Structure formats: structure tokens, C-alpha cells
Amino acid sequence: MAKAKGNREKIKLVSTAKTGHFYTTEKNKRNMPEKMEIKKFDPVIRQHVIYKEAKIK
């Protein structure tokens, strides 16, 4: 019997500082349907900036 596919989807968090840096993570589309915004560290400019969700190509 095959295992059911989960609700989690892989996403990319892209820096709003336009440095090109990004993090990859997963999120549950059922519990959190809106786009994610989170403040994380950008090592290129060595500051905490807001990262916004983008699709992984």
C-alpha cells in the first residue's frame, strides 16, 4: 500500500535586501495558506532582514 502524499511544500525564502541570498524550508499549505515573511540573518550584508517566500523552480 502506497503512503499518502503529505501537505508540506518546499519553498524558498529570498532576502529583501537584493543580495541574492536565500534559505530553503518547508511549510504546511493547509495550516498557512498565505505567503510567509520572516526576519532572518543575511550573511552577505551581515544584518537581519525580512525574507519573503518564493517558489522553487
Swiss-Prot record:
PROSITE patterns: RIBOSOMAL_L33. The keyword Acetylation does not apply. Keywords: Ribonucleoprotein, Ribosomal protein. GO terms for molecular function: structural constituent of ribosome. One of its GO terms (biological process) is translation. One of its GO terms (cellular component) is cytosolic large ribosomal subunit. NCBIfam families: PRK00595.1 (NF001860), rpmG_bact (TIGR01023). Belongs to the bacterial ribosomal protein bL33 family. HAMAP family: Ribosomal_bL33. This is Large ribosomal subunit protein bL33.
